[in-house]
UniProtKB/Swiss-Prot annotation:
Self-association and partners: Component of the NDC80 complex, which consists of NDC80, NUF2, SPC24 and SPC25.
Pfam families in alphabetical order: Spindle_Spc25 (PF08234)
Keyword Ribosomal protein: no
Region Disordered, annotated ranges: 261-315
Species whose genome carries this gene: Arabidopsis thaliana (Mouse-ear cress)
Gene: SPC25
Name of the protein: Kinetochore protein SPC25 homolog
Lineage summary: Eukaryota, Viridiplantae, Streptophyta, Embryophyta, Tracheophyta
Family under the similarity heading: Belongs to the SPC25 family.
GO cellular component, one term: Ndc80 complex
């Protein structure tokens, strides 16, 4: 402004205007430079910043791609690890289930073993009992065989010495021979029926004295063998009364034969429901002891056998 005032004071207007124009252009140029510099500096900085950012972005993208690749690899590794872990867990679960099943099976086998042991003990006990029973059965079988032999011997003796035999039917028929000295083959018989716990005399070849009392005594004592012996004695008495001589001797020898007879007992069953049941069962049991109450319990003696032979000879 001082220049303008100096020019305005001494120069002309033209020069003044030219000077002012130069001054204005100079100022405009300076202001333009200032503006250009003001505008260019931030832009340059912005461009530089943008370039740096672009470079950083590119580098970040490269790093991002690398990170993505690493992430994919990590994911693949994770999948593999998870698969291995899953297989291990599945294997562990299978092992646990197998262990549990094995433990259950062991428990079942333990219970079965205990059960088998108890069954074995029971079987051993039963076998021991069966062996004892078998041993007793063998002993009993031997005794039964001996008893059968004794029974056959007794029956044979009665059949031979007394001509005695039994028939089953409606009741039991007892038949004797070797009673009548004149006719040794003459048969004497009587039939006894047993039913409702009562003995009944159905038939007899001879009308004997005291027969009703004998039947009553039989029902009281249930001693059928004694009744049979008494009946034979009654038959014998009826025949001895017919002999004129030696009747006492014959009676004594016949009594000796009866005394030497092996003891037997009879049990009858006269159920009439079926034809098979019509057959009465006759059981003959050899007594093992000698009794003082009956002479029939005495065993067979040699003298008795000799007497029976003489008796047959006399007849």
């Amino acid at each position: 402004m001082e220049q303008i005032s100096n020019i305005a004071g001494g120069d002309t207007t033209k020069e003044t205007m030219a000077s002012l124009g130069l001054i204005c252009e100079k100022d405009i140029h300076e202001q333009r430079l200032k503006i250009d510099s003001f505008i260019a500096s931030p832009f340059r900085r912005s461009m530089n910043s943008l370039v740096e950012r672009a470079q950083a972005t590119a580098q970040s993208q490269v790093e991002l791609m690398n990170l993505k690749a690493d992430l994919r690899e990590a994911e693949d590794e994770l999948v593999k690890v998870l698969a291995v872990k899953t297989r291990k867990e599945a294997r562990q679960m299978g092992i646990r289930d197998s262990i549990s099943a094995t433990q259950s099976r062991i428990e079942v086998l333990r219970r079965n073993l205990q059960l088998q042991k108890s069954k074995k003990d029971d079987s051993v006990r039963i076998i021991s009992q069966q062996l004892q029973a078998l041993s007793k059965s063998k002993d009993n079988a031997g005794k039964v065989t001996e008893d059968k032999a004794d029974i056959h011997e007794a029956i044979s003796w009665y059949n031979h010495a007394l001509g005695f035999h039994v028939e089953a039917g409606h009741g039991v028929k007892f038949t004797f021979t070797n009673i009548d000295a004149k006719r040794p083959t003459r048969e004497f018989s009587f039939t006894v029926h047993y039913g409702n716990d009562i003995y009944t005399l159905l038939d007899s070849d001879l009308q004997l004295d005291y027969i009703n009392e004998m039947v009553q005594e039989l029902n009281k004592t249930n001693d059928l063998f004694r009744f049979v012996r008494l009946m034979r004695e009654q038959f014998l008495k009826s025949t001895l009364s017919e002999l004129p001589t030696h009747s006492g001797q014959l009676q004594q020898e016949t009594s000796a034969i009866s005394a030497s007879a092996p003891a037997i007992s009879f049990s009858t069953d006269t159920n009439m429901s079926t034809p098979e049941n019509k057959r009465s069962k006759v059981q003959v049991n050899r007594r093992q002891k000698r009794g003082s109450e009956s002479p029939l319990l005495a065993p067979v003696s040699t003298s008795a056998t000799r007497r029976s032979s003489r008796f047959k000879g006399k007849k």
